[in-house]
């Protein structure tokens, strides 16, 4: 058969993301993470209200834990919504 091999497909799938915006937090230096700092926390939340992954934001494991805890506290205090804007 003259089709593409699975190795060729994997290379295509693993390629650079086309059309995506730059990671929002890679240029942000995270200092003190506070649940009351909603403007900073919004940079780590997707449009649907989910906490962005480390591989997207580029923060360390410790910083990701602090961000997740701060986002959850801010949601509990009604500073951030639990769900995003939806459709």
Curated annotation (Swiss-Prot):
The gene is rpsR. HAMAP family: Ribosomal_bS18 (MF_00270). InterPro entries: Ribosomal_bS18 (IPR001648), Ribosomal_bS18_CS (IPR018275), Ribosomal_bS18_sf (IPR036870). It comes from Clavibacter sepedonicus. This is Small ribosomal subunit protein bS18. It comes from the Bacteria. The keyword ATP-binding does not apply. Belongs to the bacterial ribosomal protein bS18 family. Residues 1-10 have a biased composition (Basic and acidic residues).
């Amino acid at each position: 058969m003259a089709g593409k091999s699975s190795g060729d497909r994997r290379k295509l799938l693993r390629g650079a993301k086309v059309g995506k915006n730059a990671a929002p937090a890679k240029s942000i230096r995270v200092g003190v993470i506070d649940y009351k700092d909603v403007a900073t926390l919004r940079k780590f939340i997707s449009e649907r209200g989910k906490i962005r992954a480390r591989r997207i934001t580029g923060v360390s494991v410790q910083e990701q834990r602090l961000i997740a805890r701060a986002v959850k506290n801010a949601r509990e205090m009604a500073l951030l919504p639990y769900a995003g804007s939806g459709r």
